[in-house]
Amino acid sequence: MSQTSSNPATLRLPFKEKLAYGLGDLGSNILLDIGTLYLLKFYTDVLGLPGTYGGIIFLIAKFFTAFTDMGTGIMLDSRRKIGPKGKFRPFVLYAAFPVTLLAIANFVGTPFEVTGKTVVATMLFMLYGLVFSMMNCSYGAMVPAITKNPDERASLAAWRQGGATLGLLLCTVGFVPVMNLIEGNAQLSYIFAATLFSLFGLLFMWLCYAGVKERYVEVKPVDSAQKPGLLQSFRAIAGNRPLFILCIANLCTLGAFNVKLAIQVYYTQYVLNDPILLSWMGFFSMGCIFIGVFLMPGAVRRFGKKKVYIGGLLIWVAGDLLNYFFGGGSVSFVAFSCLAFFGSAFVNSLNWALVSDTVEYGEWRTGVRSEGTVYTGFTFFRKVSQALAGFFPGWMLTQIGYIPNVVQSAGTVEGLRQLIFIYPCVLAVITIIAMGCFYNLNEKMYVRIVEEIEARKHTV
């Protein structure tokens, strides 16, 4: 075990450990984003599935993995035999390889009719989601085991979001050019690009495993009365008001973000008639996200997490509204998208810092420390959001009359504009109301909670 500070709330983490933790979300987002960005288009344009079928695949698979996330959390909180690798790190190490194989397999076509292709694609995506849950939930849930310092948690969240943003940038900017290296065979080009990106994702996950340390792993004696089983774990979630509000917020914001990502490839090709623009837009907008991630820790120290979170949402809304009303050209689309993504950087970064703080809140309220279940309760809502966000674009593409590889009608173009701009705005406004009116955990309250928890331990 590494040396810890006498006061866990003041422990400072070394730079290389923060970097290693950020590499973890770089790797996991590469493995995730190639599917988020391109799998629906692969289903519709290469496999020949109707948009609704592609949406149903996402809906079923993501709802399934919402429950596998919860199962992963309960499994983590039920572990009693903790080896030298730690409580969470082994799953980062061992699950990353099958995740890589299945991320590639998702882009493999089958010689069946539409129904057979749909069934195989659904099963592959569900299996991918199962092992991804084991890897990614363990990665996210170990933050409370790394540090109890709220500033360091915010810093880890920034590094995590930086890694996630870089992963999204690489997938947005690089995937299509890599595909284009294989000419004349769309199926093979998808497999080639997916293989290359997935192998890099695997490498970064293993570097994360090697570079982070678990310092605060509490292993209680094996006692059925103390073991955090299903009922106790759900009690910890149900009585955790900040966690519940944060789950609602993520249901909205992640849904908005994922719909935007899924539709932008259609928007640039069929509305702006410039598919190459997606790479440039990704480059500049992700650069703005990096700026937001860099500024986030300082903004949090000055204004607090809640105010920065809501401020980011307001910037996001402004960017999307400007794009809808004034973003008819390529340059204006990129400029206003940069503004929206800059605002989203604060929101997406702070999600991970806020959910880590709710672990102590839940322990303070119920007496049960359930890092795994708190985190996966949070990701349950994120997966539900991803399920709906995966289904909704595919279903809406059918409703607005989208036909692949042809000039779209005026009604279809307007439908794409509303999907990529207005729909995210509405969800962002709902989130502003939820966080502004109902989220009650601030920095002063968190410090008091940690002190009371430590005092309880000394009196037992």
Swiss-Prot record:
InterPro entries: MFS_2, MFS_trans_sf, Na/Gal_symport, Na/Gal_symport_CS
Coiled coil: none
Membrane-topology annotation of the record: Multi-pass membrane protein
Localization terms from the record: Cell inner membrane
UniProt main location, coarse: membrane
GO BP, one annotated term: transmembrane transport
Gene Ontology molecular functions: symporter activity
Top-rank taxon: Bacteria
Record-level GO cellular component terms: plasma membrane
Keywords tagged on the record: Cell inner membrane, Cell membrane, Membrane, Symport, Transmembrane, Transmembrane helix, Transport
Segments on the Cytoplasmic face: 1-18, 68-91, 144-161, 212-242, 297-307, 351-386, 440-460
Ranges that cross the membrane: 19-39, 47-67, 92-112, 123-143, 162-182, 191-211, 243-263, 276-296, 308-328, 330-350, 387-407, 419-439
Periplasmic side: 40-46, 113-122, 183-190, 264-275, 329, 408-418
Family: Belongs to the sodium:galactoside symporter (TC 2.A.2) family.
Function comment: Could be involved in the export of 2,3-dihydroxypropane-1-sulfonate (DHPS).
Designated name of the protein: Putative 2,3-dihydroxypropane-1-sulfonate exporter
